[in-house]
From Swiss-Prot:
The gene is rpsI. It comes from the Bacteria. PROSITE patterns: RIBOSOMAL_S9. Disulfide bonds: none annotated. The keyword S-adenosyl-L-methionine does not apply. This is Small ribosomal subunit protein uS9. Belongs to the universal ribosomal protein uS9 family. The keyword Ubl conjugation does not apply.
Amino acid sequence: MADTIQSLDQLSALKPAESEAPKHTKKVDKYGRAYATGKRKDAVARVWIKPGAGKILVNAREVDVYFARPVLRMMIQQPLVAAARAGQYDVVCTVAGGGLSGQAGAVRHGLSKALTHFEPELRGVLKKGGFLTRDSRVVERKKYGKAKARRSFQFSKR
């Protein structure tokens, strides 16, 4: 009990413990690919990236074929554009569950996480853009005694 602190001066004189924040390291498999999973609504995407010509495959199909709407394709490209890495990585992903919008969001989330595994220094840029945060908004459940989640049945006064 000899190292009990008796005053504020002793407390302020103490040096902080050497506990650094964990360093993010490059995580790639034996094939040189970075892997991550992304989620959005009910969709789950498994994403692999490796250096390449910028080809994006979704469920073994070109991104232009799988996501016909330009807005969805733009959503997937956002992390690469924000990190100034468009056209530098080949992306292969499998996505299941949900609709097309949820699937595009899941691919975007997984792609962002895979980019940080491949290049940890991009984490700040992607975090600032909000690409690494899991969007927790999901469909509200239906309640009994109601037509839908919040909509009541039609009310007749008489």
